[in-house]
Amino acid sequence: MAWSSLLLTLLAHCTGSWAQSVLTQPPSVSGAPGQRVTISCTGSSSNIGAGYVVHWYQQLPGTAPKLLIYGNSNRPSGVPDQFSGSKSGTSASLAITGLQSEDEADYYCKAWDNSLNA
């Protein structure tokens, strides 16, 4: 059986123009159906490393971005457990297990300073 490769395109997302803090993501990640892929999000000591929380969004073609992970590793209601998030040091990652064709999308990471909510 031939496996068609999936391509997950990624776009870097800024934490906010006032902060001028940039997060770096790879331009693309690919995997075969059923596989596990990990998408990295690299920040710095002024954002992720400073304790900012990381959120992940999925944008399917022709649709608005959907929140996948909030607060580093929490899934909103309705998001399947094939998606998981983690954070370590100045980087974060989104893991997708059991890759499916419908997972082909743009994925964004965002770092947020929770102290702004206080």
UniProtKB/Swiss-Prot annotation:
GO terms for biological process: adaptive immune response; immune response. Keywords: Adaptive immunity, Cell membrane, Disulfide bond, Immunity, Immunoglobulin, Immunoglobulin domain, Membrane, Secreted, Signal. Residues 71-73 are annotated as: Complementarity-determining-2. Residues 1-19 form the signal peptide. Immunoglobulins are composed of two identical heavy chains and two identical light chains; disulfide-linked. Probable non-functional open reading frame (ORF) of V region of the variable domain of immunoglobulin light chains. Non-functional ORF generally cannot participate in the synthesis of a productive immunoglobulin chain due to altered V-(D)-J or switch recombination and/or splicing site (at mRNA level) and/or conserved amino acid change (protein level). Immunoglobulins, also known as antibodies, are membrane-bound or secreted glycoproteins produced by B lymphocytes. This is Probable non-functional immunoglobulin lambda variable 1-50. It comes from Homo sapiens (Human). The gene is IGLV1-50.
